Amino acid sequence: IEASKAFAKDLMQKYNIPTAKYRVFTDAPSACAYIDAEGAPIVVKADGLALGKGVVVAQTVEEAKAAVRAMIEDKTFGQSGARVVIEEYMEGPEVSVLSFTDGEALVPMVSSMDHKRALDGDKGPNTGGMGAVAPNPYYTKEIAAECMENIFLPTIRAMRAEGRPFRGCLYFGLMLTKSGPKVVEYNCRFGDPETQAVLPLLKSDLLTVMQATTNGTLADASVEFSTGSACCVVLASEGYPKKYESGFPITMSEEAAAHCYVAGAKKDGDTLLTAGGRVLGITAAAPTLRAAVEGAYRLAEGVDFANKYC
């Protein structure tokens, strides 16, 4: 359901789960002809796993066709791009909802908003995620009820009907369009960096909830979240998700270290070095969203490495 976007789209189409109109292609000329017919903006996705970088939101026909050729002909993402999904462009706020499910019951976690673009102002290429806030300010109780009825429960029922019952953490990437919530993608795991903003708000014991998920007793479990907000800011190597340098020493204050989630970094003796694009995340929780965001950026100032970008 995550490793093949074509599988996920076909599943949604078969079981009437709302999502964007799409077509699947394995050859560039056919895909480019479809793009010519549909026009832009349009979305091109590598079918397989691509570390969160296999999606191009093309603003022009030429940009979309270049993305298709890069994936299918140039094999930018190897076999993951041998097949591409071309989707209609959707507009609206994005929402991430992680959930616990034992295949029968489903319990959504507090909603979140992932910021995927590399630059401020929703600009730049897509990344694995440059930060997240929870809860999502656009996700109302009414929208949550609609998603439960039309998306969440139908998805786990569809997996059961296909003989592939899902048990674990199921992530719903949603867009709140004018015609209602629609699925952008599924992940069969905790999202990064959404998890770093969501789990600090969990009041219940995580191990107990996960045991209930694996044991098939989730319907009887207590899953509670606090009413506050949390913000995770990703500190990246400048240049990510394209070319960047690594191997720089990382220093941080004691307070920042207490709120730090290490990602693209490695130990060299007693020294922590950068070793990836998204180096680490800093999370702050507070009674309000504004206070959580301010707290996360204040903590991020306590972290330093040569090409830090956030």
Provide a role label for each language-model segment.
Residues 212-310:
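Peripheral (often C-terminal) accessory segments that flank ATP-dependent C-N-forming ligase machineries
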Residues 36, 69, 153, 296-298:
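Solvent-exposed alpha-helix faces
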Residues 40-61, 198:
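Conserved anion/nucleotide-ligand pocket segment
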Residues 1-38, 42-43:
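Conserved N-proximal alpha/beta basic substrate-recognition cap immediately N-terminal to
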Residues 24, 57, 285-286:
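A structural signal for short, well-ordered beta-strand elements
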Residues 146-170, 187-257:
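Active-site "cap" helix and flanking loop/linker of ATP-utilizing ligase/carboxylase catalytic domains
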Residues 54-195:
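Internal nucleotide-binding/catalytic subdomain
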